């Protein structure tokens, strides 16, 4: 913000983060430098120069219809919605950075329009939003487009999203509109709190809130063109286009949701309560105290570190009784810590999962975020109505309660050991590559190499150690953290970590090459799909660990998004029967009506499998990740049929269709 000082007459002021903050939060240095550069530029002239904006805040019916007609003829417009009580209260449109309108639907506690006028306005809004010739620019359109689709059946298209662009350009930075305005809008005074104040008091100034809404649309027309130039300069415009194309399938899947076994959730919650009661009694017996509250950090610190005299565990310089600290205490034989961890787990299962608020039709829905993680993965959260949950991190217990719609079959197809395979090929680790290409059990091989026993003699425990190593050590996890995560003695963890890197030397050689590339290429890495990421945080081990994970994680995300989600959603000419439901990092979920026939279901499975298994190319070498398939009437792995990739490859379609028919009959019996 560039504003006039209230203390020094005729002086301009630019609020700035204190430079000392960069010592604690390294990324703040970029904001500080940006503000100081702006201060230098602003020092060249005395005036406060802000872009003049013509904001229509009290539109007549004629004004509104005329403006929307203008929008309908534009190449692109920006829009922003505001919601109150799950109803559309305002919508703003901008045709350029200087001209915008706020179309209100409420004024205080009254309607702004007569019923016939409101109907005409909404129809005209729908015409603009669905016009295929007019690009709609927005911020976090997953929210806006979901609401307009859920509430009015309006399918907003085509879309351009400044939040997605921000997530591609600078994954380390905030993606909120307030931050983007500070970055791209040349000193525009901060206005975002105006909206928050109105929501606290809807009887406050209508004009202030309407200006806030109109500004949100106007600034988008200023921000987006600058982002496009940066994306093109960075070589990430294609990456942005790919990520943006996920909006429509994610809006569809978020609104579709999945049917839940509501009776099963109630019963599971009752069982959870019984276990909580039992664990509470166990804790009282183990501690000798009936008043010890497992949710009180103050009481737990006092109990473990004062009463019991244990040396305190710290986190960022502060005494801690978080889950990591409790795991360490439990590993050292303190039974109370183990009981508290179990209590926390049961309470989370009860509060977060079994007692979650579903929609009235008994479905779990979510809101997907196309740039929810820094590495390109999709994330999800509760819906804008406060129902549902993160659909991607549900534990096995609640996944087992996810049901197919009547007459449908659920299908889950996942990439086998996807990240591990990508690591093997980009690291050039020949032992790993050999195992994957010859179909050798990679966990068994790693267990064999660590334990120095023939692979045919590897025990279940040794294979388990191999599996833990394969899952945990590709990104330079230290032995102490490895011990904590897998709850084993540090001596054993150190042995496994050292042996792993001894038998797979290519992994640490690859780490060296990543560090060299960061240094040589201005902190920039490129994944197998050409997606570039600049790593801006403090140079050192923590940044390096994130960088090691970038190429494998983002490559798998791109593979799943392009050859899974978009392949199914965009090719409705091939898959008119397929209903896309969810994507979870390295897997895709959908359902198909049984009425299409078993042969057709096998055709669909094989087509999706072939798409997922398209080769990935890394520096001249191509490799493929096999896709396994699970089928069932719920996502309970105990009741699903599992077909490994090689089994589907080597089994005739008629045989697979016959197996599926037998399974369906058995489940119906």
Model regions: which residues?
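Conserved RNase H-like, two-metal-ion catalytic cores of nucleic-acid enzymes
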Residues: 48-179, 183, 273, 424
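A short, charged helix-loop
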Residues: 9-21, 182-208, 217, 221, ...
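Acidic, low-complexity intrinsically disordered tails
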Residues: 46-58, 62-65, 112, 636-669
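Mixed-charge, glycine-rich, non-catalytic linkers/tails in nucleic-acid processing enzymes
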Residues: 47-55, 156-162, 168-171, 192-293, ...
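Acidic, glycine-rich two-metal-ion catalytic cores of nucleic acid-processing enzymes
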Residues: 73-99, 108, 115-120, 127, ...
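Core structural elements
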Residues: 89, 140-141, 187, 212-227, ...
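Extended, well-ordered alpha-helical scaffold/bundle regions in very large, multi-domain proteins
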Residues: 238-336, 475-514, 600
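Glycine/proline-rich loop-helix segments at beta-alpha junctions forming the active-site rim
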Residues: 1-50
């Amino acid at each position: 913000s560039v504003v006039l000082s209230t203390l020094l007459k005729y002086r301009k002021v630019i609020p700035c983060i204190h430079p000392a903050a960069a010592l604690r939060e390294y990324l703040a240095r970029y904001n500080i430098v940006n503000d100081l550069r702006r201060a230098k530029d602003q020092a060249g002239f005395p005036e406060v120069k802000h872009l003049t904006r013509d904001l229509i805040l009290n539109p007549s019916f004629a004004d509104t219809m005329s403006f929307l007609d203008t929008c309908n003829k534009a190449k692109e417009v920006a829009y922003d919605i505001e919601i109150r009580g799950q109803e559309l209260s305002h919508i703003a449109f901008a045709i350029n950075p200087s001209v915008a309108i706020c179309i209100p639907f409420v004024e205080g506690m009254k309607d702004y329009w007569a019923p016939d006028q409101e109907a005409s306005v909404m129809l005209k809004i729908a015409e603009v939003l669905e016009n295929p010739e007019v690009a709609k620019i927005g911020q976090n359109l997953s929210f806006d487009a979901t609401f307009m689709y859920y509430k009015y059946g309006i399918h907003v298209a085509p879309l351009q999203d400044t939040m997605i662009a921000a997530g591609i350009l600078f994954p380390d930075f905030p993606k909120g509109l307030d931050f983007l305005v500070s970055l791209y809008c040349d000193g525009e005074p901060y206005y975002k709190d105006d909206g928050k104040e109105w929501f606290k008091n809807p009887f406050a100034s209508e004009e202030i809130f309407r200006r806030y809404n109109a500004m949100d649309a106007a600034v988008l027309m200023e921000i987006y063109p600058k982002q496009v130039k940066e994306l093109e300069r960075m070589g990430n415009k294609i990456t942005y286009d790919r990520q943006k194309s996920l909006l429509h399938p994610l809006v569809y899947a978020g609104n579709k949701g999945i049917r839940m076994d509501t009776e099963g959730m109630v019963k599971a919650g009752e069982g959870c309560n019984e276990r909580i009661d039992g664990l509470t009694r166990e804790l009282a017996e183990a501690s000798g105290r009936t008043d010890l509250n497992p949710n009180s950090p103050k009481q737990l610190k006092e109990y473990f570190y004062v009463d019991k005299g244990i040396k305190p565990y710290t986190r960022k310089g502060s005494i801690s009784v978080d889950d990591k600290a409790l795991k360490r205490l439990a590993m050292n034989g303190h039974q109370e810590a183990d009981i508290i961890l179990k209590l926390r787990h049961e309470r989370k299962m009860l509060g977060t999962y079994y007692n979650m608020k579903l929609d009235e039709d008994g479905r779990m829905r979510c809101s997907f975020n196309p740039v929810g993680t820094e590495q390109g993965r999709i994330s999800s959260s509760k819906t804008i109505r406060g129902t549902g949950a993160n659909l991607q991190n549900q534990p096995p217990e609640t996944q087992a309660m996810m049901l197919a719609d009547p007459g449908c079959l659920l299908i889950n197809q996942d990439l086998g050991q996807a990240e591990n395979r990508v690591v093997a090929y980009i690291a050039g680790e020949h032992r790993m590559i050999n195992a994957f290409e010859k179909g050798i059990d990679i966990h068994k091989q790693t267990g064999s190499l660590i334990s120095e026993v023939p692979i045919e003699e590897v025990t279940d425990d040794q294979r388990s150690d191999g599996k833990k190593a394969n899952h945990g050590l590709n990104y330079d996890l230290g032995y102490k953290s490895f011990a904590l995560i897998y709850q084993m003695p540090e001596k054993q963890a150190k042995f496994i970590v050292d042996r792993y890197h001894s038998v797979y030397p290519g992994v640490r050689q690859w780490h060296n090459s990543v560090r060299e590339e960061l240094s040589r290429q201005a902190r920039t890495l490129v994944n197998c799909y050409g997606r570039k990421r600049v790593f801006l945080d403090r140079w050192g081990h923590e940044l390096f660990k994130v960088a090691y994970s970038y190429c494998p994680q983002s490559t798998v995300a791109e593979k799943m998004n392009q050859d899974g989600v978009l392949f199914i959603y965009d090719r409705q000419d091939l898959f008119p029967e397929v209903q896309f439901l969810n994507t979870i990092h390295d897997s895709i979920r959908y359902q198909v009506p049984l009425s299409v026939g078993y042969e057709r279901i096998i055709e669909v499975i094989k087509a999706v499998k072939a798409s997922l298994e398209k080769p990935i190319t890394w520096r001249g070498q191509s490799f493929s990740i096999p896709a396994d398939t699970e089928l069932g009437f719920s996502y309970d792995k105990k009741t699903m049929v599992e077909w490994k990739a090689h089994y589907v490859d080597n089994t005739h379609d008629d045989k697979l269709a016959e197996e599926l028919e037998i399974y369906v009959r058995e489940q119906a019996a």
